[in-house]
Amino acid sequence: MSEAPRFFVGPEDTEINPGNYRHFFHHADEDDEEEDDSPPERQIVVGICSMAKKSKSKPMKEILERVSLFKYITVVVFEEEVILNEPVENWPLCDCLISFHSKGFPLDKAVAYAKLRNPFVINDLNMQYLIQDRREVYSILQAEGILLPRYAILNRDPNNPKECNLIEGEDHVEVNGEVFQKPFVEKPVSAEDHNVYIYYPTSAGGGSQRLFRKIGSRSSVYSPESNVRKTGSYIYEEFMPTDGTDVKVYTVGPDYAHAEARKSPALDGKVERDSEGKEVRYPVILNAREKLIAWKVCLAFKQTVCGFDLLRANGQSYVCDVNGFSFVKNSMKYYDDCAKILGNIVMRELAPQFHIPWSIPLEAEDIPIVPTTSGTMMELRCVIAVIRHGDRTPKQKMKMEVRHQKFFDLFEKCDGYKSGKLKLKKPKQLQEVLDIARQLLMELGQNNDSEIEENKPKLEQLKTVLEMYGHFFSGINRKVQLTYLPHGCPKTSSEEEDSRREEPSLLLVLKWGGELTPAGRVQAEELGRAFRCMYPGGQGDYAGFPGCGLLRLHSTYRHDLKIYASDEGRVQMTAAAFAKGLLALEGELTPILVQMVKSANMNGLLDSDSDSLSSCQQRVKARLHEILQKDRDFTAEDYEELTPSGSVSLIKSMHLIKNPVKTCDKVYSLIQSLTSQIRHRMEDPKSSDIQLYHSETLELMLRRWSKLEKDFKAKNGRYDISKIPDIYDCIKYDVQHNGSLKLENTMELYRLSKALADIVIPQEYGITKAEKLEIAKGYCTPLVRKIRSDLQRTQDDGTVNKLHPVYSRGVLSPERHVRTRLYFTSESHVHSLLSILRYGALCNESKDEQWKRAMDYLNVVNELNYMTQIVIMLYEDPNKDLSSEERFHVELHFSPGAKGCEEDKNLPSGYGYRPASRENEGRRPSKIDNDDEPHTSKRDEVDRAVILFKPMVSEPIHIHRKSPLPRSRKMATNDEESPLSVSSPEGTGTWLHYTSGVGTGRRRRRSGEQITSSPVSPKSLAFTSSIFGSWQQVVSENANYLRTPRTLVEQKQNPTVGSHCAGLFSTSVLGGSSSAPNLQDYARTHRKKLTSSGCIDDATRGSAVKRFSISFARHPTNGFELYSMVPSICPLETLHNALSLKQVDEFLASIASPSSDVPRKTAEISSTALHSSPIMRKKVSLNTYTPAKILPTPPATLKSTKASSKPATSGPSSAVVPNTSSRKKNITSKTETHEHKKNTGKKK
């Protein structure tokens, strides 16, 4: 055939039902049967030439069945045997050829066939050679002006691999002069080689993630190997931070592109599969820029059907891979569209006389969304949480003056003289310090140089600390600071005059400890898992566990999630562990940290420079120390001076202490007793080499306490009050984690040091309200500005990443967008933010009963422990007028974090999670106002009664820790005793009550000592009602099975209200977090040990069981550690649930404003990115259009509106009925960095 045929068909225009056509797969056998039924015109033959695995795949069959419904098209599939073994002359004839390369396909023969027969070719064959080489692909993309990650190509000669332009550093590589800092990506140049490696920086834990073609349920694996490959040619490229999701785009011609989101294989390597075992993917809408990219890719590579990978990062879209011919799997709509477009392309090319129009399927935007329900609905739009890091090892510090030339050489080598200061964190740098310490100690052994001799104990400690954890340095654990002192250390009066002290020296400060413990990881991961349940669920089964609503939102790009952390290792690891729980990830924290956690230290958002502490804070510390140095009982003046805010917890601590100096004497003698006990243990050969929690030895524990003993009391007998937080830190750690040592009087030391710390720690952030506010602003102003911008919608609708509603049948709310901003930080920021909320005049206590109750609760809270959370949630009521102040609604929640080691009765309890709002309180409904909502009104009335007649106590509900065991191993059977059912001898409470299985959707009950599991319908959990309503239901059902008399009596009598405040964050961290198969046996064997550690004497054993979970955390180097208690986390308490956005915005503006003038009106209050939530007020509204600007209503109108309208914020919600409104909303997600600059840079 010299040229492509053109078919001219006669005027016959008979209507033929395409459904009557048989599907053409093996046409040769059917020719005779079909002859009479076929139209008289010659058919256009479309030939499919590919390997059998591809041509017989489900997507190909689905599409070919549809293509063969075209009246004039016949499909012929070339058999694999013919393709491989027959010469091209014997291949079937066709008019149009669809042929593509895959493993084992003879592309040369296909090219020869096309040359011989000259058919119309759908996917250009010569370009398929280029697609197999990533270098060529990148070159074409670059020529087309398509954005690519920054990259460099390393070509190696296979015969001489060592000769290449590659210089490898500890945390970077240099390729042809181009430097790539870790994390970076290493891709083989052959596109057929899927072994792509991502290398992580040592600061995040080092190692690499190795990606490969899916094998079962894995697509990548983490490796500790940090060095790049030494053979083969590679492309090195910058790693793009995509928040853990990739987009795969499939074109059919230049004008059609279908896009799907899936979890990035680099995140944890676990392939998410649905109930049919297929990888979970979600269709997303491409923005205009991405559609242009698809158009360019399709035309540049001359591939009509073409797949490529997009990375959405930094507000841009980058192409990182072009795969050539590929179809979408499992989308009927795509199959219809693809067949229609391919058929039209063929007809237009080979039968132009039909004038086939360009028929592109309707865009998503053109499809109307039909509303399904009506009524009052509150829709969660935004969740902002500020969270303290998890349980950590005690922070330790050692200072020494060094004068040896080797230290000066190191200081000079690292450019220390530029600023006079140097911070060494990298393994290579720490190794150099260790080498110097070893060398000096060796010299000391050989001769007595008096200058070095002076520092011998400190040099030994320096060496010991740097040698901890074996040879591998993790930059997260330790750091050395060197400061240049031109005249040596300042002299103290007791020092002899010494001319040498005038010479320059270096102050070496070694900091170590303060790492997140395995218990801290468990806490963070569990809290993340519990946070999931704040988001309403979609229909269908995502992965068979609760909180799937959030996971669906996230993987479909409808969850605009950003996680920020300060630059401390423990904070970053807490954020990564939280993300792991929140997004149901598996594996190591390093890949999660690198991809999901943004460091916020660039703009001072979450970090603070201790050198720049305000003079106010210095004054406060001095006054505090002065008061606590007086050797007398506290007087009325002391109470007045120390507790002007009237804090109940402070007054309680002062009552306990009475005389601060006498209490310090007791603490000092208890520390002396402790150090002597540890020395005694070290002398005992049985326990000399005992391993304590987290690899600590008795020797290190002794050094820790000896240093405190030495530093706490000066030679003149005065106490250093600044050491009290450190003493409390250490004893709390040992009580929780080293209880097995059974050291005497630890609980007494804990009690006294806690009482002192409860005064010192909060009061260091200001004694009077004015001081607290001033110090808080110093720490928190950038964060307050950022929170304010998070609550406003400042992005442009055009850049939105949206789910494609047409393709997403199983998704309830295709246009729902939700914004979550999580800020992980240290104690200082949490104290400061809480001070701002308490003392910054957000509400008036005298006029607002709910706020007064919240302040009373906060006055009782004595410690903001690990995992403290401050949560702000923004709702929208789409039924309210756009200009109404009631359209946007803000709620404020708080949890003081992990419980301490004291009895439960000492724990403060607030009024619960989401108690009835203030407006609802004074109003008893005489009749049901709305026939549609009888249950809601009833429930509101119950809430009102509870608030008026009974204080609400939030009882913890444990979220079951998801064990990595296979499903069959996870369930405790009747004959297998679960470690969770350990009951206290006194019968004062059992673990069982606290692990009522709500989080796993299973009900647990007690029968003797056994646990049986019975499923709770998912409907009662997260799918048709808000998670909280359903938790009430499950808890009340559970009430019949729980045999814990004391707890039940103390709980509210009314089962309906049973746990309406327990909610999400009544999630004490669940124990039994082991991944070891023999846990049950271990718990049975060690039952006695588990319930009576050294820190819990017999009298408090029962309550201890409730306060803690047992964590059998596996340590990377030491196998199983000694068992350790993981403290439960206090439930979230509602501080206020009836704030308007206008009120909150003006408050935040006044705090963030540098001047004292507070603008009375904000120029615009925009709605925020939607967030799915734990509790929807009444019914959840979806798909509302949110205007870019909402002008504040004039005050007069507001009053009347408020008076006339029913508040939508009372009590727990009734069942949530998803709704689809006809109005659309377009919520956007521009880059967060831009968002921050934009909002901090301008004042509203």
UniProtKB/Swiss-Prot annotation:
Q: What class of enzyme is it?
A: transferase
- Residues recorded as binding substrate, renumbered to this chain, are K53, K54, R213, K214, K248, R262, S326, F327, V328, K329
In this chain, composition skew of type Polar residues spans 1211-1221
Where is region (Polyphosphoinositide-binding domain) located?
371-442
Determine if Transport is one of this entry's keywords. Answer: no
Which keywords annotate this record? ATP-binding, Cytoplasm, Kinase, Nucleotide-binding, Phosphoprotein, Transferase
Q: What residue spans carry the Low complexity bias annotation?
A: 1196-1210
Report one GO cellular component: cytosol
Basic and acidic residues: bias regions: 916-942
Which portions of the sequence form the region Disordered? 899-942, 961-1017, 1187-1244
On this chain, the residues bearing Phosphoserine are S38, S223, S1007, S1017, S1075, S1092, S1166, S1173, S1181, S1221, S1222
Q: Name one GO molecular function term.
A: inositol hexakisphosphate 5-kinase activity
**Record's PROSITE patterns?**
HIS_ACID_PHOSPHAT_1
Q: Does the keyword Transferase apply?
A: yes
Could you say which EC number(s) this protein's record lists? 2.7.4.24
Main location as per UniProt: cytoplasm
An example GO biological process term is: inositol phosphate biosynthetic process
Its recorded reaction(s) are:
1D-myo-inositol hexakisphosphate + ATP = 1-diphospho-1D-myo-inositol 2,3,4,5,6-pentakisphosphate + ADP; 5-diphospho-1D-myo-inositol 1,2,3,4,6-pentakisphosphate + ATP + H(+) = 1,5-bis(diphospho)-1D-myo-inositol 2,3,4,6-tetrakisphosphate + ADP
Q: Where is the composition biased (Basic residues)?
A: 961-970
Q: Name one Pfam family in it.
A: His_Phos_2
Role this protein plays: Bifunctional inositol kinase that acts in concert with the IP6K kinases IP6K1, IP6K2 and IP6K3 to synthesize the diphosphate group-containing inositol pyrophosphates diphosphoinositol pentakisphosphate, PP-InsP5, and bis-diphosphoinositol tetrakisphosphate, (PP)2-InsP4. PP-InsP5 and (PP)2-InsP4, also respectively called InsP7 and InsP8, regulate a variety of cellular processes, including apoptosis, vesicle trafficking, cytoskeletal dynamics, exocytosis, insulin signaling and neutrophil activation.
The record's similarity note reads:
Belongs to the histidine acid phosphatase family. VIP1 subfamily.
The record comments on the domains as follows: The C-terminal acid phosphatase-like domain binds PtdIns(3,4,5)P3 and InsP6. Despite its similarity with the phosphatase domain of histidine acid phosphatases, it has no phosphatase activity.
Protein's UniProt name: Inositol hexakisphosphate and diphosphoinositol-pentakisphosphate kinase 2
**From which source organism is this entry?**
Pongo abelii
